[in-house]
Curated annotation (Swiss-Prot):
This is Mating-type protein ALPHA2. Belongs to the TALE/M-ATYP homeobox family. Transmembrane segments: none annotated. Keywords: DNA-binding, Homeobox, Nucleus, Repressor, Transcription, Transcription regulation. It comes from Kluyveromyces lactis (strain ATCC 8585 / CBS 2359 / DSM 70799 / NBRC 1267 / NRRL Y-1140 / WM37). GO terms for biological process: regulation of DNA-templated transcription. Mating type proteins are sequence specific DNA-binding proteins that act as master switches in yeast differentiation by controlling gene expression in a cell type-specific fashion. Transcriptional corepressor that acts in conjunction with A1 to repress transcription of haploid-specific genes. Residues 151-213 bind DNA. GO terms for cellular component: nucleus. The keyword Magnesium does not apply. Forms a heterodimer with A1.
Amino acid sequence: MSRIPIHSLLNPSESCKSISNVPSNYRDLSTFNKERAKVITTFQEMFYSMLENNDDYNKIESLIRNFQPKLTWSHKCESLTFKQKAYLTAIIQKSIKSLLVLLKEKGKMREIEFSRKEVRKINKYRQSSKNFESVNIKILTQDLMHSNNNEFKKGKRFLKSHIQLLENWYSMNRRNPYLAENDLAYISKNTTLTKTQIKNWLANRRRKDKITEVSSDIRNILN
């Protein structure tokens, strides 16, 4: 037989009010088990959907918003034990973390696939141009592929001092990391890099930041 909390005995009206605020379909343990199964099934469907390239942060955020009421209910429901409440919370949090890890890894895979596509474009261009010179794949973008032949130069690794200057500028302008013409001229003058190389480096840096970004809603529920 389940014990009735002393607080409920001393405050029956408050106890009734608390129960009435809980949806009727959440009031017994069998319903809790059904809800737990729904949580697991929903996250599994989301996981496989993301594997099929249907992934974005908006879907994850929407999923979190849908399950936030369940977390609130589980914390307040007196018919659940502490262990059951912790179990339901852990399922949701660990599932969200799994989705975020998958999203991050898929971002890395997209970068690899992007590089492979660029290599294929270069090989195709090389076959059609006798005067083609090798370029640095890491800083090559689609803009360079459409440039004139005389703009292609043999690529070299950026010097550490050049990278440091670019990183410093990016850190100071992270909220709006897009170069004004005077900034572009300054960096080009002090690094001997071409304007195209600088723009390409910043484009890659922005892409890297975007992949690792986690929305505030997701951070809040995981903390």
